Structures are given as structure tokens and as C-alpha cells.
Amino acid sequence: MKLPIYLDYSATTPADPRVAAKMMQYLTQDGTFGNPASRSHRFGWQAEEAVDVARNQIAELVGADPREIVFTSGATEANNLAIKGAASFYREKGRHIVTCATEHKAVLDTCAQLEHEGFSVTYLTPQSDGSLTLRQVESALRDDTVLVTIMHVNNEIGVVQDIASIGELCRARGIIFHVDATQSVGKLPVDLGQLPVDLMSFSAHKIYGPKGIGALYVCRRPHIRLEAQIHGGGHERGMRSGTLPVHQIVGMGEAYRIAKETMADDMTRIGALRRRLWQGINRIEAVSVNGSLEHGAANILNVCFHYVDGESLVMALKDLAVSTGSACTSASMEPSYVLRAIGLSDELAHSSIRFSLGRLTSEEEIDYAIQLLQKSITRLREHSPAWRAFKAGSE
């Protein structure tokens, strides 16, 4: 067993060796290095064919038509293109957007930018487990609502939103529905042939693909239109200009192909490991789950260790790679806005740690993590006046 143990798979994953090997075939002179937009020679034709294969692999995992897949530089850009693109194109229809206070910053900051441009945004406060009810969403809709954007799986607490019901509601009202599926695709079944979703954002590096590449699903039936946010060449059917990075696209396609084959077995095994981790942690006094074990994704466990400062705990757990929030905000000393949105105090939010498990996580690593947590928390609480007061009050 190698130390430190990586338990931060929701931040990023290592590229699968098969993905890396595939990508190398599209980088050097000995490989397929051409520009897929160069249609006058074989180098371009081969590159275009590789892109088409990858586009099909991605579409197959999510039950989409390959023509509905638009490549971007990552899920952040896909979210920007979906939200800004739809809002701009349909602005004459309405200028009201509905989202959730626990969305990723890639969605929240994009919505905030649209507020500066004259749009009105309603930020729904989730229930204590992080979920939204259909009634909450329905009550927020207005005559001028043009877009609803709700993530499928929350990156910090793992709660799974009922995107099927929300999508049906939006479809009935003629409102565009966007889903950030960065944390769900390749981990939960997604069938866009059945789901009433208009736009869906994907990433590669969350499921053992390369960083710097993502995609946006843009529904053809009903036909969804977007205003391009990047101009210069009209690539990707005019929705996203820029030379396609063939090696990254091929890597994403290979990662999605592998995920389609292994997802069911992976998540059964990872779910068992998460239960094992929680059973061990739950033997520690004064701990609680943030979110829901029952309605959460199998790979994420967010735990509050009462009477322990989270930053001190992370430092004490130098042999564990874990986080106190999302990777995009982990440098901030502010408590997690997601945990505050579900009702935790700043103190409890600061005392919380996210564990996210992956394809390479082993039972041995989980057992080591449990032992280290038990020892570290006992040691840290020995120096905690709040813990001593709690113990004195409970005796």
C-alpha cells in the first residue's frame, strides 16, 4: 500500500493507462496528428475519423445521438455555454433563471454574471439532506422563466437530484432544463434518450480521462438553440469554435468506453467500500453524515467530526488525500457554502471532511484510513475545550 492514500476522486482521477496509451497515438509524427478540419488530405481524414469514434463512444454511454455532443475544454466551459448560450438565445422569451444554492461554482458564477447582464436568478435552498423537492422548483417558476439548471450529483455531499421529475416539469412548461452531470456520468446510469433534459454538461477527468476536455449535450428533439460564446471558425456546428484537440477527445472517448463496460461493477464495489468507511467512522463518538447515505452517490461520503477543526484534521491526516470542500474552492478559508446552504453552522462546516472513493480504492486503504481517523480525532479532541465541555455536559 502506497502512502498517501488518495481519497479525493471527486476532485480528479488519474488517467486510466488505456486512456493514456490511446492518447499517445494522436500526438507525434508517427501517429495521427492531423487537424480534423483539414479535409483535403489523409492526415485530416484520419483525425476526423478518430473524433467521430470518440463522439460515438461518449454518446453511447449517455444514450444520446452523436450529433448532440459538442466538445468543450471541460465541464466549466460546457456549463458556461449551456447557461449563457441558452439565456442569450432565448432572452426575448424571458430573463429569469432558476438554480440551486449548492451548485458548483461553474454554475453559480455563470448565473451571477448573467445577473450583471440584466437576468433575474432564483437560488433555491435545498433541504437538510441537500435535495430539492419538485414543489420547490415548481413554486420558483415564473412566466418569464427561460432556464432551470440543476446538477445531477452534488460534488461535495453526493446527493442525487431527481432530474427526471424536474425535467418533466420543465418540459411541460416549455422551459429549458440544463443538468451539470460532471459527478454522475460514468457512475450512475444516464439515458438521455429517456430523460427530459435539454442540455447536459460532461467532464473527462472525473472518470479517468484527461483534463482539459469536456462536452455538452445539446438536445435535437426538441431542437435547442444556443448562442455561441467562442467565435472563430464555426467548429462544432457553430456552437464552439476552436481546433479540436484530437488526443484529448480520443482520451475522453476511451474513458467513456471503459466506463460503459465497468460502471456497474465499479459502483457496486465502491459502494461497499463507502459503507465500510462509514461503519468504521461511525464508531467514533460525535460524528454525522452531511447529506444522505440513502439518496447519495456511492462514491462520496461527507462527514462532520464534531468538536474538531477540519483544517487541523486535514493537516493531521497527512497520509490521506481528502478535502474540506470542492477542489475549486479548497484554497479558501471560508467554510463550505454547500454545507452552510443545508443548514450547518460555520463551526460544523469547518469540522467536515469529504471522502471520495474511486476505481483504485482498496479495502486495505479504507481500513488504514479508519484507523488513522480514530487516532487523529482522539488526539485532536484532547486539546479541544469544546470537546471537554461536551463530555462534561454528557456525564
UniProtKB/Swiss-Prot annotation:
The protein's annotated pathway: Cofactor biosynthesis; iron-sulfur cluster biosynthesis
Catalytic activity: (sulfur carrier)-H + L-cysteine = (sulfur carrier)-SH + L-alanine
Gene Ontology CC terms: L-cysteine desulfurase complex
Cofactor(s), names only, from the UniProt record: pyridoxal 5'-phosphate
Transmembrane segments: none
Enzyme class: transferase
EC number: 2.8.1.7
GO biological process, one term: [2Fe-2S] cluster assembly
Lineage top rank: taxon: Bacteria
Gene3D superfamilies in alphabetical order: Aspartate Aminotransferase, domain 1, Type I PLP-dependent aspartate aminotransferase-like (Major domain)
Compartments where located: Cytoplasm
Function field: Master enzyme that delivers sulfur to a number of partners involved in Fe-S cluster assembly, tRNA modification or cofactor biosynthesis. Catalyzes the removal of elemental sulfur atoms from cysteine to produce alanine. Functions as a sulfur delivery protein for Fe-S cluster synthesis onto IscU, an Fe-S scaffold assembly protein, as well as other S acceptor proteins.
Record text on subunit structure and interactions: Homodimer. Forms a heterotetramer with IscU, interacts with other sulfur acceptors.
Name under which the protein is recorded: Cysteine desulfurase IscS
Organism: Erwinia tasmaniensis (strain DSM 17950 / CFBP 7177 / CIP 109463 / NCPPB 4357 / Et1/99)
